[in-house]
Amino acid sequence: TMYGTSSDGSVPPISDAELNLFLANLDCSGKRKELMRCALSLVGRVPYFWGGKSAPGWNSEWNTPKLVTAAGSSSTGTIRPYGLDCSGFTEWVYQTALGVTLYDGTWNQWDATHAITEEELLPGDLGFMAVPGTVPVNHVLLYAGKDADGNKLWVHCASGTGVVLNSPDYVTQYRRRNDVDLEGDLVPAALDVEEAGTSG
């Protein structure tokens, strides 16, 4: 299966070929495709870790045993494989793909975004389980498009699975990052000036 969990509960990583096919079938801007490329690159590779955050790029400490120090979880004070929490994942994706911050925590990410309708959802937009403050623990996800049956796909870092691409039914709030143009294409970062010039 392209997404979800295996019969043993593990999440298989998405292969490069599957990732390229998924991106080719997305009808969205280059910036949004880059968000999806970064997000999907962690599927099955990074575990859930309460309070887990990371600088942009691959973190060599992921999957190594670490003490959970963030308060508020039954895993606090235990040793777990290091990874990301839900908001740490969405922040990592935006930072790695575009150099844009979403801030730490679901509440701050809610405040950095504005409401959109379900019909306005585009890959890279955020989904939340609930309005902050209405549930003890919230959850944030990245919209990834729809599957062949029209089900909404979300890529997110969930407890129990780590980073996964699936179709949870609990997403009730749809949001988009404030003051960031996600509709343009990426400007190549390492364009060689000589290659860009014209030959006579």
Segments from the language model and where they lie:
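...with weaker cross-activation on analogous glycine-rich loops/strands in unrelated enzymes
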Residues: E91, Q95-D169
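Short, low-complexity, polar/charged sequence segments that are solvent-exposed and flexible
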Residues: L67-T69, A148, Q173-R177
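General structural signal for secondary-structure boundaries
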Residues: T1-Y3, S15, K31, G105-W107, ...
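Low-complexity, Gly/Ser/Thr/Pro-rich intrinsically disordered linker/tail segments
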Residues: V171-G200
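Polar/charged alpha-helical tracts
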Residues: D16-N25, R37, E120-P123, A148-N151, ...
